Amino acid sequence: MGDTTKDDGSSQSKAVRGEKRAFFFRKWTRIDIARASAVGAVHLLCLLAPFNYKWEALRFGVILAIVTSLSITFSYHRNLTHKSFKLPKWLEYPFAYSALFALQGHPIDWVSTHRFHHQFTDSDRDPHSPIEGFWFSHVFWIFDTSYIREKCGGRDNVMDLKQQWFYRFLRNTIGLHILTFWTLVYLWGGLPYLTCGVGVGGTIGYNGTWLINSACHIWGSRAWNTKDTSRNIWWLGPFTMGESWHNNHHAFEASARHGLEWYQVDLTWYLICFFQALGLATDVKLPTDAQKRKLAFAR
């Protein structure tokens, strides 16, 4: 079904009009400060890239952004969070490991947060609710861990991951892996590989993910009659690996395919199809015709 919507994409969602959480004038925990410092450092390195770069370093940064972003969407999101398909562990674990270098945290934390988002979408318990403003849902929520804990409680919704030694190992050693990787990158290519790799690559990856949490709940079109503010933003599709078909996703969250129409670019789905053709991705979930009819807008 196409984007049969009553919203032409030019209007803002009502979700942006709500009481906003105080950001600067509050108690900051050490984790908040560490996260803000890391995100700030990545963006600062990106700003320094024009003054200290090499073309091969820039290519490295773009390739890294593509690989790590695909790992986030393929592994953290569709495989681990929603269980949209199954992989053998020897393939599942490397994808989850490579997603570490998107600098978005370890699988247990990421998956837990996203499951809470779907459980409490657009409510006061949504960890990055657009009700609290664009910038809160885009990035500020990341630096307010005490508030998120108050909203959602503990990480009791990821026992399937906590029971696996590999994900506990990543949770306990994530800093070591990231520090080792970027030390090796620096020794290999020097400062340009940090400004273009960490800086450019990290900034692309960060904001690609963040725009799903913010823009895709404010602007865009609605193809399905969901009880939330989720939107599809077509032009973000290629840059977000297909994640910006967000109204499609909230309508059928277990679906391995987000770009439900042939013209809706979904790079993550193409990767899933590749592994499915090899017999490695199994139990691939898609919405049924009955599910689509239930959520379709009346014509």
From Swiss-Prot:
Q: State its cofactor.
A: Fe cation
> What are the alphabetically sorted keywords of the record?
Endoplasmic reticulum, Fatty acid biosynthesis, Fatty acid metabolism, Iron, Lipid biosynthesis, Lipid metabolism, Membrane, Oxidoreductase, Transmembrane, Transmembrane helix
Top EC class, one word: oxidoreductase
> What GO terms in the biological process aspect are recorded for it?
unsaturated fatty acid biosynthetic process
Q: How does it sit in the membrane?
A: Multi-pass membrane protein
Return one GO MF term.
oxidoreductase activity, acting on paired donors, with oxidation of a pair of donors resulting in the reduction of molecular oxygen to two molecules of water
Instruction: Map motif Histidine box-2 onto the chain.
Output: 114-118
Q: Where is this motif: Histidine box-3?
A: 246-250
TM stretches of this protein: 31-51, 55-75, 174-194, 198-218, 262-282
**What CDD domains does this protein's entry cite?**
Delta9-FADS-like
Please list which residues make up the signal peptide.
none
> One matching Pfam family, short form?
FA_desaturase
- Top-rank lineage group of the source organism: Eukaryota
What EC designation does it have?
1.14.19.-
Q: Name one GO cellular component term.
A: endoplasmic reticulum membrane
Q: List the disulfide bonds.
A: none
Functional pathway: Lipid metabolism; polyunsaturated fatty acid biosynthesis
**Subcellular location(s) of the protein:** Endoplasmic reticulum membrane
Residue ranges of the motif Histidine box-1: 77-82
**PANTHER family (alphabetical):** ACYL-COA DESATURASE, DELTA-9 DESATURASE-LIKE 1 PROTEIN-RELATED
Please provide the record's free-text comment about the domains of this protein. The histidine box domains may contain the active site and/or be involved in metal ion binding.
Q: Which family does it belong to?
A: Belongs to the fatty acid desaturase type 1 family.
What is the official name of this protein in its record?
Delta-9 desaturase-like 1 protein
Q: Which organism does this record belong to? A: Arabidopsis thaliana (Mouse-ear cress)
List the lineage, top down: Eukaryota, Viridiplantae, Streptophyta, Embryophyta, Tracheophyta
